[in-house]
């Protein structure tokens, strides 16, 4: 979502599961605008965003738009894959550019590492001198990874620890709030709430604060607003001469920050 001259713009995925049987793509990108965030007006821009030749028409989704100040244009990225077997590792992020948010030009691949079967929920933001590109990789690992670059043209560098959280912290995106970059995604639930069962399509919302380390890589931590949401409850004290105590918040056992090991 973007606000330009008091008008809000939202770009989203339009989906029709019956279209493939009619020879049409099941997914297209859509554009709507609003002056009050209540009443929205769809545009007819979907035709501009149809899957391009050579790309899978049924895996073309999750647009993300930023303002590219250096080139005086808007940049839209989305998740895609090449046409072919779904098991092939042809996932990529593709890009469009525009001067007015209405007329878009397809610019090809933005990041195409051929490491994953699909890129989902791509994100792009800048902290200091570094650009960061986040995707949720659709594979057996199903986790969020990121790359970093000092230019939107790349090269995109893979840090040693390139993931946020673990397996099945999924489909996250970020926003900036009061100078903080918050990453919000969901953690999948196991069938019948049994750890030995498969993941199911549902889960628990989880927010991380993303912060930049001195070397430019990213880390995550619990947002202060979450820490401050409730008072800790004493669970028990460890009977040793260091006097450590364990507290519980939201049914999770936490060690107070002043006792935590620092990286």
Region annotations inferred by a language model:
Residues 1, 5-62, 66-121, 126-165, ...:
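Beta-rich carbohydrate-recognition and catalytic domains
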Residues 166, 171:
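Active-site/pore-lining binding-face segments in mid-to-C-terminal subdomains
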Residues 181-183:
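Short, well-structured beta-strand segments enriched in hydrophobic/aromatic residues
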Residues 236-263:
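Secretory/extracellular carbohydrate-interaction modules
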């Amino acid at each position: 979502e973007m606000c330009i001259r008091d008008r809000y713009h939202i770009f989203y995925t339009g989906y029709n599961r019956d279209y493939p049987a009619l020879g049409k793509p099941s997914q297209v990108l859509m554009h709507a605008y609003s002056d009050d965030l209540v009443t929205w007006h769809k545009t007819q821009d979907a035709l501009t965003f149809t899957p391009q030749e050579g790309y899978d028409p049924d895996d073309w989704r999750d647009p993300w738009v930023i303002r590219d100040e250096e080139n005086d244009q808007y940049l839209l990225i989305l998740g895609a894959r090449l046409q072919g077997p779904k098991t092939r590792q042809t996932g990529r992020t593709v890009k469009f550019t525009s001067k007015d948010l209405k007329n878009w030009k397809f610019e090809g691949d933005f990041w195409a590492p051929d490491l994953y079967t699909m890129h989902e929920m791509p994100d792009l933001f800048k902290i200091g001198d570094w650009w960061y590109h986040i995707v949720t990789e659709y594979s057996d690992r199903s986790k969020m990874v990121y790359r970093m670059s000092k230019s939107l043209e790349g090269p995109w560098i893979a840090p040693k620890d390139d993931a946020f959280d673990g397996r099945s912290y999924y489909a996250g995106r970020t926003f900036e709030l009061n100078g903080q970059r918050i990453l919000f995604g969901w953690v999948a639930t196991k069938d019948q709430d049994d750890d030995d069962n498969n993941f199911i399509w549902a889960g628990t919302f989880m927010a991380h604060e993303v912060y930049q380390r001195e070397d430019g890589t990213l880390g995550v931590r619990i947002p202060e607003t979450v820490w401050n949401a409730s008072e800790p409850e004493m669970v028990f004290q460890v009977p040793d001469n260091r006097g450590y105590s364990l507290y519980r918040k939201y049914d999770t056992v936490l060690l107070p920050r002043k006792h935590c090991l620092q990286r």
